[in-house]
Structure formats: C-alpha cells, structure tokens
Amino acid sequence: MEAKAVSRFVRMSPRKVRLVADEIRGYAVNEALDILKFTNKRAIEPLTKVILSASANASVLNNKVDFNQLFIKKIYVDEGPIMKRFRPRARGRAARIRKRLSHITVVLSD
C-alpha cells in the first residue's frame, strides 16, 4: 500500500530543500522525523508537514496500518514557478531577483 502527499508552491529554493530530502530518503517515518528534528535547516518545516500528511493519508487508506512499518519510498522536490522581483541599483539600473518555489512530493510504503 502506498500513501502520497504533495505540498506545492513552498516558498523555498528547491536546491536547498533537496539537501535535506536526500538525507531522509529510504528511512522509516519515525527515524526520518527524528533526523529532521535535529537538522538545522529551514527546509525541515515543510518536509515534516508533508511526511505527517502522507502518514495521515496512509491511515485513511488502511485503518490497520502499522506506523512503525511505514518508510519513505520516494521523496522528490521539483521546481515551481519563479517570482521575478527587481531591486533598484545605482545609476537608474535594476537587478533582477528570482524567488524560487518548490513542489515537494512524498510517497510512503509499508
């Protein structure tokens, strides 16, 4: 049985979220949450929410699911749209700022 959860338009660079997502791929859900608890990155908040959402989806799909058996089968971070902003610079010029968004997908299996 597989349970899936997706968080879209997360206001964080996909490259930075992938650093943390790569660390927890393949771990059991409990172990992954423990690893995230002691990781000092901003990306742990959306990743934790998506993992908890996927585990809740697993309990809806199967009432007798054992949470100790669930592990992260797939976790990937895709690039979302880019918000373009401008910062004024000297002599009337402007510098473009690209604010990147992420789509986080987690698939749990038992």
Curated annotation (Swiss-Prot):
Gene3D superfamilies: Ribosomal protein L22/L17
PROSITE patterns reported in the protein's UniProt record: RIBOSOMAL_L22 (PS00464)
MF terms in GO: rRNA binding; structural constituent of ribosome
GO biological process, one term: translation
Short name of any one Pfam family annotated for the protein: Ribosomal_L22
InterPro entries, per database record: Ribosomal_uL22, Ribosomal_uL22_bac/chlpt-type, Ribosomal_uL22_bac/org-type, Ribosomal_uL22_CS, Ribosomal_uL22_sf
Keywords: Ribonucleoprotein, Ribosomal protein, RNA-binding, rRNA-binding
CDD domains membership: Ribosomal_L22
One of the record's GO cellular component terms: cytosolic large ribosomal subunit
HAMAP family listed in its UniProt record: Ribosomal_uL22_B
SUBUNIT field: Part of the 50S ribosomal subunit.
Biological function: This protein binds specifically to 23S rRNA; its binding is stimulated by other ribosomal proteins, e.g. L4, L17, and L20. It is important during the early stages of 50S assembly. It makes multiple contacts with different domains of the 23S rRNA in the assembled 50S subunit and ribosome.
Similarity-based family: Belongs to the universal ribosomal protein uL22 family.
UniProt protein name: Large ribosomal subunit protein uL22
Origin species: Leptospira interrogans serogroup Icterohaemorrhagiae serovar Lai (strain 56601)
